[in-house]
Amino acid sequence: MAQRNGMSPRPPPLGRGRGAGGPSGVGSSPPSSCVPMGAPSTAGTGASAAATTTPGHGVHRVEPRGPPGAPPSSGNNSNFWHGPERLLLSQIPVERQALTELEYQAMGAVWRAAFLANSTGRAMRKWSQRDAGTLLPLGRPYGFYARVTPRSQMNGVGATDLRQLSPRDAWIVLVATVVHEVDPAADPTLGDKAGHPEGLCAQDGLYLALGAGFRVFVYDLANNTLILAARDADEWFRHGAGEVVRLYRCNRLGVGTPRATLLPQPALRQTLLRAEEATALGRELRRRWAGTTVALQTPGRRLQPMVLLGAWQELAQYEPFASAPHPASLLTAVRRHLNQRLCCGWLALGAVLPARWLGCAAGPATGTAAGTTSPPAASGTETEAAGGDAPCAIAGAVGSAVPVPPQPYGAAGGGAICVPNADAHAVVGADAAAAAAPTVMVGSTAMAGPAASGTVPRAMLVVLLDELGAVFGYCPLDGHVYPLAAELSHFLRAGVLGALALGRESAPAAEAARRLLPELDREQWERPRWDALHLHPRAALWAREPHGQLAFLLRPGRGEAEVLTLATKHPAICANVEDYLQDARRRADAQALGLDLATVVMEAGGQMIHKKTKKPKGKEDESLMKGKHSRYTRPTEPPLTPQASLGRALRRDDEDWKPSRLPGEDSWYDLDETFWVLGSNRKNDVYQRRWKKTVLRCGLEIDRPMPTVPKGCRPQTFTHEGIQLMGGATQEPLDTGLYAPSHVTSAFVPSVYMPPTVPYPDPAARLCRDMRRVTFSNIATHYHYNAQ
């Protein structure tokens, strides 16, 4: 197909070529662009596979029997399972968040038929019936696919209306079942089961749904939860389903599908994944593994260290607790807040640090030399208080052990070893020199590596394990508790991904209260992306129909070559090359659609800033597109929502991030001081407590301790019991609790202490109390006078 200009009035429809995919759907891509270097021309090995050459393409086409579970005549992408696209998409590393241009075009080519049918809900249902059995990749993570399935063949779905979970969408249609590859060697019981053809597992109860504008959802049937995977086709082709935490839960995942946190020490793995003896988990961690650094793997970001805690008070060695006026009181207040939120006993598992501290040697901050102090010994028989200082009893199975992936990982390319020691523990490279080196530990003193001397590592998240086996993360940046995983084995595969994609799970109120789901990010659920320019109302006319939009998205280049050339001349760009690539795509898209990028940015809430004068400029930077160094800085993006801003800060290890404000005066103050006895809490009782507090809160913001103080605010002050004494919302002098009449000087009246006012914990109950005083006659009289 001849190469087309992005400014053509109406590009011709893309030929079906290989149906739902193949290099023919890429439009003007080179013939060999979809075949990776070194990849074989055909993936089929059967003698009956007829190898033919598609006219106009340099791809060696095969005609295999189709994807697993598909009928023999199915077929828009019947060659995907044995085609070059599957080989290309199987090489995406787990640390990478976005797909490359070649992988992007492969995703768009495979999903071409679904995109063209995304006009109405009826058209999507017809497409799912016509292409039933077709296997489509999810991009990220590798090994997950969407098997196109009509709704009538989805077990347990019935007449579920997904618009109740997303009311702003005009229509949402369930079109596929999410399946994933299974390693038969990892689970011999699978074998040739009927439910696992060709090593594919479909027992997770996950379904893929599509909405208007190619909004992609993942529906969790067991939890009745709708997860927003992508807001448009551009985001789906670029990121896939890698941000969906629920995908990483299945314990039948094959080796490296996706790769989990590597715990090569069998003793530590058995300690963390022990289900029947979970009460002794905390004692075992304190006795043997306190201070051990685990290289935590989170999909879509770099490795980061997680230091296993021996006691809750050890958090005083890390920021932001170390710089608090009184760290012990702040930790007590935080522990009290966690007791109120979790409504059961819990265990502080570890502190997650920024990636730059991985491999830095240090000892515990106990006043001695680094690496020479043993962790504090904990008696195996002593009784400890609940709420972070004592192990918790877990009801139910936590999960099976995660198989160790054979491939190495880490910055150096080597594996990792974790050797217990009487002094400290480590995670170091698996080469001979590293194996012979002494073990190290990440602490708060004597830091080595990229950090300056005297600096203290910052705890970005504190991993918690509640009494029911669920894993939560306490974020010291904003003081909230976020769900991370349903069990420990799930956490070792998903890492802290649950805190990086906040506000993307919609569930009924009872389910959200049970799992402590955060509030929905209305910006993501109710508005399109501001940089999805192919959906802009002022875009060119040819980009308003499906064929034109697909040709626009899959056109080659999109300004990335210029950025890569510019990065070779300016090494400073390499640190944030993904941001510059995204800006280059925006500029190229705006030029192809005839839009002014500066106007679009300002309409969305951002502005173009001049590098020298720092004043808004409406002129678009054209020098970057010519390969020259720009005298303008990158266009500032529109202001992010608090949840999106926090997720970006956690993903990029932004240690300077601060919340915008403290909890307001109308926030809900929890007066619950109940002491939860470990091992005596039933699951239904815990869920009932969480639901009751959610009803009492009535959607108000939670009054909570804030370890990270916003700019221009005073630090919060707490008593030894964790009760806040005074707020820090402003720089103005606050009320000290001393009361005196305004017409009498304080010299003649002794000061009288007035305790600070406590907000009423239950606004709904207060309203009911006030309504009891209103009789029917008063209401009738009030209505009569208003009517007059």
From Swiss-Prot:
Low complexity composition-biased segments: 26-56
Effect of K126A: 25% loss of viral replication
Entry annotated with the keyword Transport: no
Location relative to the cell: Virion; Host cytoplasm; Host nucleus
Compositional bias ranges of the Basic and acidic residues kind: 650-659
Keyword Calcium: no
Region (Disordered): 1-82, 366-385, 609-663
Outcome, altering R246A: 25% loss of viral replication
One Pfam family per UniProt: US22
Record region (Interaction with host EIF2AK2/PKR): 671-788
Keywords: Host cytoplasm, Host nucleus, Host-virus interaction, Inhibition of host autophagy by virus, Inhibition of host innate immune response by virus, Inhibition of host interferon signaling pathway by virus, Inhibition of host PKR by virus, Interferon antiviral system evasion, Viral immunoevasion, Virion
Entry GO CC: host cell cytoplasm; host cell nucleus; virion component
GO BP: any one term: symbiont-mediated suppression of host innate immune response
Effect ascribed to mutating R151A: 75% loss of viral replication. Complete loss of dsRNA binding
Region span, RNA-binding: 74-248
Bias kind Gly residues: ranges: 16-25
Gene Ontology MF: a single term: protein serine/threonine kinase inhibitor activity
Function: Inhibits the establishment of the antiviral state and the integrated stress response (ISR) in the infected cell. Prevents the phosphorylation of the host eukaryotic translation initiation factor eIF-2alpha/EIF2S1 and thus the shutoff of viral and cellular protein synthesis by directly interacting with EIF2AK2/PKR. Prevents stress granule formation in response to eIF-2alpha/EIF2S1 phosphorylation, thereby rescuing viral replication and protein synthesis. Also inhibits host autophagy by interacting with host Beclin-1/BECN1.
Subunit annotation: Interacts with host EIF2AK2/PKR; this interaction retains EIF2AK2 to the host nucleus and prevents its activation. Interaction (via N-terminus) with host BECN1; this interaction inhibits host autophagy. Interacts with the viral DNA polymerase accessory subunit UL44. Interacts with host HSPA5.
Similarity comment: Belongs to the herpesviridae US22 family.
Domain notes: The N-terminus binds RNA. The C-terminus is required to bind and antagonize host EIF2AK2/PKR.
Entry protein name: Protein HHLF1
Record organism: Human cytomegalovirus (strain AD169) (HHV-5)
